[in-house]
Amino acid sequence: MLKTTKKNHSSTEARILQKLIHFFLTIFLISILYSMNPNLTNVPELDYYNNQTLKLLAPKKDCDCEKTLFFTSNLRNKPVQINSDIYDIIQYKNRKNFFVTYYMGDEEYEQYENLIAQHEIIKSINALGDSNFYLGKRCINLIKKNRNLMKLNNFKKFYRFFGYQILMKDTLYQSYRNMKEEFNEDYNYMAETYYYPHDKKIIKEKFRKYELNMNDLWLVKPAHLFGGYGIRIFESLKNIKAKNYLLTKYISNLDLINNKKYDLRLYVLVTGLRPLRIYFNQEGLIRIASQNFTLNEEFIKNRYVHLTNTGVNSISKDFIVPDNSSNEEANIWNLKMWAKHLKQLNVDYNEVKSKISDIIIKSIISVYQNLTLLQRENNLNDINFYDLLGYDIIISKNFEPTLLEINSGPSIVYHNQLDKPIKTNLLVDTLNLLGIKIYNKNNMFHKQKEKKISAEENIKNALCELSRPRGDYQLIFPLKENINKYKKFFKGRNTKENKLFWKIIQND
């Protein structure tokens, strides 16, 4: 009996040992497979969906473009124009092998989840997964920290290739000044500015004896803050504690709305760098200060007089929230209301808009070399990245625009009935222009090999993009009529893709 018990016990131990060996061997094999393909288990959401119904732009037979997602908005007053010579609108139903997923990287974008869900796009919970597109300001950091995401394919789109450092107030102005030294007459869209510590000697010499002077006002701007935070009227050098700041000439000769200072928040989409494509959205916001403008010394420190940022003015008791697009007393307008304001002053809206487009193009060219260098250093394919930029522009009494700053990743959270359709349609138009592609769930892992896309492929992708519906976006560069005007600013900074792309456009 004892022998039998020992025998059974030994047999049990053997079975347990066998199972343990089998378990660890399985884990070992999975780890090998995962190291060969880190995305193998990165899309768990796909196991819970049998199908998606996707609305697609389907190219005609003679077009080399691929099918891409088509987004719609119920907040648009007019339908988006589709080039029926190139595309059909179709629906994929019950195609269980085709899926589209997205990853939401910031809480700020949560308001748009309902919009995306309406198009049956699946939300991924895995930041390191295989999503088609990634929304959020931290996407570029995801890539830098996780080399597996560097193995990009044509199905992935990441928000923000503009490193925020490139658009900081100090680096943006330095890029502008570098271009101004080379093209003095062309680069004149920013106010006179000095940067500490770079211009330490000049600042000490120029402002050593400066005292507050209503006829010679300057602003102190922290170099690395946004949203109007830390901006104040300059009084004297001894009052500045910051280690990095800008001293900027105060523009006091301003056009006013309802006797108040205002600026423009405009939206610009850069869909690629090689070749460079810049789109200017024809909808935007006019941000109006909450108290009347005055240079009276009594009000010189009043932020509600001198700053236009909505985040600053929204806490003022005088701030009027817009309830529709016709309330001219509100502190936020849309561009149509501003165009009406200009018309009443006998000012040509299109002429002012053309000057703003000129600023947008030149400012992006000024940082172009840094951006392409960032791409090369990180071995990033052009097709995988895009950036939505928020331009802040102020208008003088002579209706000359001046660039205040550029925001990479402007807020697309809506706060009222005026900006809700503007920002919703902005996202819809952005996604349509980007051309989000569907992937085959069964074959997706065969496409994960790291691949350097050729110049010819980049140009083909750019040409397909030009045929997509743009909604409120307008292509402002490159155009047949402005390539020759702007190409001189690429001197020593140009790319093979740009030159080939421009040639195609000019010969079209």
Stretches found by the model and what they are:
Residues 37-150, 160-163, 167-182, 188-190, ...:
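Acidic, PEST-like segments
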